[in-house]
């Protein structure tokens, strides 16, 4: 795996950051892109750089991370996290998902996860960045300097975020299912 310093990063473009990370990895076996969202597009995540306080959370409409599944456990790669790069999955899960706090929240905030094998994510994701444009056609946040992702195909980011969508080579999981997959 590459270091955090080698990873390309642009704030508020997590789907592209993960794409660029996976793209740089020669052996994509065991690497997964994980899209986190829910029906109301409001997912609380803790230990995020965008949080207004140390113990606070961010309410994203979606977030994308990479997970590397290994024999001795899994590692999480989240460039927006305040946790270390290549964080142990169990630590990331405990501190970022914060299930104790989530138990006190409305069920509409429960997160779902679209799990996509790394190789599939590289060929599947297509983004024209239109979701980051204001009504006036101005970017809400500065776009990455690299070219659009798979711009020869129609943009499909919004479909990938909708957890009700059936998309080939992807699996939608709830919190217990994702935990079971990567906690071993």
UniProtKB/Swiss-Prot annotation:
One of its GO terms (cellular component) is cytosol. Pfam families: Nt_Gln_amidase (PF09764). It catalyses: N-terminal L-glutaminyl-[protein] + H2O = N-terminal L-glutamyl-[protein] + NH4(+). Its EC number is 3.5.1.122. It is an enzyme of class 3 (hydrolase). Belongs to the NTAQ1 family. Mediates the side-chain deamidation of N-terminal glutamine residues to glutamate, an important step in N-end rule pathway of protein degradation. Conversion of the resulting N-terminal glutamine to glutamate renders the protein susceptible to arginylation, polyubiquitination and degradation as specified by the N-end rule. Does not act on substrates with internal or C-terminal glutamine and does not act on non-glutamine residues in any position. Monomer. This is Protein N-terminal glutamine amidohydrolase. The lineage of its organism: Eukaryota, Metazoa, Ecdysozoa, Nematoda, Chromadorea.
